[in-house]
Amino acid sequence: MAATDVNGLASQMNSVNLNGASQKPQKPAYVPPHLRNRAAPPAAVPPAAPAAYRPSPTGLPTPATTPPTRHIVPAAVAEDDVGGWGAQPRVRKTFEHGAPPGFGSWKNGQHVVGARNTRMEKEMYGEVGDGLHQATGINFDKYADIPVEVSGKGVPEPVTEFTNPPINPVLLENVKYARYATPTPVQKYSIPIVADGRDLMACAQTGSGKTGGFLFPILSALFTYGPSTPPVEQDTGYGYRRTKKVYPTALVLAPTRELVSQIHEEARKFAYRSWVRPAVVYGGADIGSQMRALDRGCDLLSATPGRLVDLIERGKISLANVKYLVLDEADRMLDMGFEPQIRRIVDEEDMPGVLERQTLMFSATFPREIQNLARSFLKEYIFLTVGRVGSTSENITQRVEYVDDQDKRSLLLDLLLAEQSGGLILVFVETKRMADTLCDFLCSRRHNATSIHGDRTQREREAALYAFKSGRAPILVATAVAARGLDIPNVTHVILYDLPNDVAEYTHRIGRTGRAGNVGTSTAFFNRGNTNIGKDLIELLKEANQEVPQWLVEISSERSYGGGGGGGYKGSRGRSTGGGGGARLGGRDMRQGGGGYGGGGRTSGYGGGYGGGGGGAGWGSGGGFPPAGGDSGASWW
């Protein structure tokens, strides 16, 4: 008992310091939250503290008494985030020109071109024959024979090759990286027109290089003249928490997220090593991540109208610095009900007026309604038509097969088995359910297929498109979401499993093949449910010097057509097509007297359209556009 008391007394004496107070128990070491769930490392025996070390009276280490086992942050990196005690310091990289390889800058009024980045070059430009990037085809030289119509005052002379001027030397290098050898007809005319500061309304065949037609001259000007100084932001009272605005210099509006993503990728490709930072925003994706991406740079912005309006309302984007406004696929945006958003963006926000900016409109078709809209958006514009507006490419061999609905699957399998080109096959259907159903059917028959439609998430769509472009799934079943504007390389066969309700949609869908001078094939499944498109389809086949089946002529003649000037029909979507002559798809400059509508031109209208003839045109009594569905994320298709 006495021994126990002696041992206890000794233990108490050891825990008493010189001032007579007991030492407090040692607190456990602080563990950062991101390390708390990890398995504890083996306990290390701490080295003996030097004799001079003693805890300070406050219990905190002082510079003179800090244990040598604690990590000291070097002064050179003390400002950086080193992740807490014990973490390894991150040394911030510095670059010769102040920007990482692949990115340039603008300093002291000079364009500082960035260093080359081989990883970025492989990603953006690909390699010869990789299947992801399309080269010009065997019929590319035939583009020189395509008729070109230009109207307006003081039209600049076209260019015949990519040269400086009018193209900036930095852009010329990027054009070579992309293996572009000769400008297409629309580029030959649009490059000098835009470089001359003129507004432009351009109409060209699908796959004719419209995107390069506006990107090349805009980027050349930006490379040459540099960025504009953003206006001074007024203090909104939110302090450090207020949203940081971005001020794009060029704005490209397009109807669908796929198309704006494609334009953005082209912009990245040709803005390589420059000070210009392209950005993209669209509906159906996380808006927070898009806002963070905008903070990394937003000089050339590609956007869908709905998402752009959303970001303007949030105070993230200002249009005060816009010098170039591009409306791509303008007719499609109006068809999808985006006119209110477009008018708000152009007329009601802080975008400079029509006299202070340059406005360009590009599309495969320009009906009269679009040309009327252009009056308020463009000033003294030049009207450019390359080839017959709304026509199909002669590089496409068009076939029309009569097949009842119950036999379509069997004929589709026969076509796939007979396919010898080894290229990509695009199958168009009308509904989202049919896209998934037909894709499942093809997979069950041992065909590698994928699908894309409005109900798939953006991640799923991008994955499907990549699988298709790379050849892992060489068959893509798609709704109208992929019908307009998308540049899918190396499509050799387009199959219209379901025919659209008007010939303009037919033109755009088969235009996914036969691009950039390459040859392609289209096969349309036709039956008596498609007689409303029969007569126009015959005319289109004749124009492109294609074979017209006799059964198609007989079925089309069975349908009675009303109206004057050769008649007209009213399609199931309410579109009315008049007979007679003229540019049926609205391809002439309406400023010229007696232009493309003189002989009973085509007019579009939803609800209450009318059968044609004469020179009548305009919206039907129940017309107007369908309700604005916001962004392209709406499942209108």
UniProtKB/Swiss-Prot annotation:
Keywords: ATP-binding, Cytoplasm, Helicase, Hydrolase, Initiation factor, Nucleotide-binding, Protein biosynthesis, RNA-binding. It catalyses: ATP + H2O = ADP + phosphate + H(+). Belongs to the DEAD box helicase family. DDX3/DED1 subfamily. Its main location: cytoplasm. GO terms for molecular function: ATP binding; ATP hydrolysis activity; eukaryotic initiation factor 4G binding; G-quadruplex DNA binding; G-quadruplex RNA binding; mRNA binding; RNA helicase activity; RNA strand annealing activity. It is found in: Cytoplasm. A motif (Q motif) lies at residues 160-188. Residues 15-25 have a biased composition (Polar residues). Residues 395-556 form the Helicase C-terminal domain. Residues 15-68, 560-598 are annotated as: Disordered. Residues 561-585 have a biased composition (Gly residues). This is ATP-dependent RNA helicase ded1. GO terms for biological process: cytoplasmic translational initiation; negative regulation of cytoplasmic translational initiation in response to stress; positive regulation of formation of translation preinitiation complex; regulatory ncRNA-mediated gene silencing; spliceosomal complex disassembly. ATP-binding RNA helicase involved in translation initiation. Remodels RNA in response to ADP and ATP concentrations by facilitating disruption, but also formation of RNA duplexes. InterPro entries: DEAD/DEAH_box_helicase_dom (IPR011545), Ded1/Dbp1_DEADc (IPR044763), Helicase_ATP-bd (IPR014001), Helicase_C-like (IPR001650), P-loop_NTPase (IPR027417), RNA-helicase_DEAD-box_CS (IPR000629), RNA_helicase_DEAD_Q_motif (IPR014014). ATP binds at residues 204-211. Gene3D superfamilies: P-loop containing nucleotide triphosphate hydrolases (3.40.50.300). Its EC number is 3.6.4.13. A motif (DEAD box) lies at residues 328-331.
